[in-house]
Amino acid sequence: ISTIKNAEELDLYLQRFLETIPSHEYQLKELYEYVNVLPESYYGAGSYAKWIRVMWALKNTSNRLLIVWIAFSAKSSTFNYSDIPELCEDWDNREKRDSGVSNRSIIYWAKNDNPDGAKAVRENTIGFYVDNTINSMTASSIANPSSNTKGAGDYDLGVVLHQMFKDEYVCSDVKNGHWFRYRRHRWHEIDSGTTLRKSISTDLRELYKSRVTELQNYLVSLDPEDEKYKSVKAKIDTAMKIILRLGQTADKSNIMKEAKDLFYDEEFYDRLDSNPYLLCCKNGVID
């Protein structure tokens, strides 16, 4: 990276990084997209304090995000490609911090300073995980249309639920099922996560219904004899199975079991005790 000399080389390095991110590390691409919607006040003239905090947050998340940091810095009108070696050296010399800014900080800044851009990134991220659950069964559905498979695993659906509500809910005790919800600038305890459970049959279910509508609208434009038609039809069938599951008591209970692990924050009580008004939990605002 330190040898990059122009915009074309920088774009090549960046695209190579983004294209090689495995699906299980999609959060790195998501963070790049959040960084990309930060306004000029984070990289333009007089932005040093914010600019350097973006670097700290990226470094605290993953050393692999150096290229994202360089690309972000290059958005400045005063950026000089001859400064890249120095920026790389500065990155390498910064130690990761146990506390302070993180990936959650970047998301918070984006939401505050570019809400429309942050909303688009969030919707794109959720869409990625929704499609993962639908596409996971497509091949087997095409091969065996009469299959009784349920469509997606409980964990996979829990991941989608987590992406939708990771800034609103936290599980503080997996064993006893203690849940908190962030509302009106405070964390409130929610009995057994009942409101999140309800969202499985409402918000999460509606998300899949919307995806089915999109796929159905696309399907009518295809030739029934086309292989693409079969693929899209299989996706619709899989999504419909998921929609049915999201209204079933047993399936909702299983998804909530997976959600406990996904929403769990082992340091939640410590942070809440130290400052009940400080929003510094993994699933809350960090700043």
Which sequence ranges carry the predicted segments?
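Intein modules and their embedded homing endonuclease domains
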Residues: 138-287
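Modules that initiate DNA replication and primer synthesis
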Residues: 2-143, 173-212
